[in-house]
């Protein structure tokens, strides 16, 4: 590589790292998530801030680059963690999640290495959806991106959920 090409690569890398430190933001995906990595396995996600966060951040790998997004996550009373995804068949990130997909969840300033699996069991999906409805009753209205659902809201047919398990 010549000096000009090396400078271009270095500039692109620096730009991507700056972009990653700012996003994901609102609807724009980001790159690498930064924070302190939690090395201890999480058995009960109620012992984290999952249900206190308006939005969680998820980082997956899309080919050779990191791809991060904001989305709803919720811990069930049993301590399971799930991700919420409406109209998920059209979401870029969801199409890239395979069985036991390695990912990172950021809750506050903490990074949790996790595995993702799409949940298809109707009983588990209903349990996850109930946790979503309950969490959204207490979400800050000023920063809320999902409308507050009624407590008796039924699970939507277009709604997917992903089970999150600790991989450390």
Language-model regions, residue ranges each:
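Short, conserved active-site entrance elements at the starts or edges of catalytic domains
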Residues: 20-67
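Short, structured beta-strand-loop surface elements
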Residues: 88-168
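A short linear-motif detector with a strong N-terminal bias
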Residues: 35-37, 51-53, 61, 82-85, ...
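Ribonuclease/tRNase effector modules and their secretory precursors
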Residues: 2-4, 52-55, 123, 167-168
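Residue-level signal for well-ordered alpha-helical segments
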Residues: 4, 50, 70-74, 82, ...
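Hydrophobic membrane-insertion alpha-helices, especially the h-region
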Residues: 1-22
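Short beta-strand segments
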Residues: 51-88, 113-115
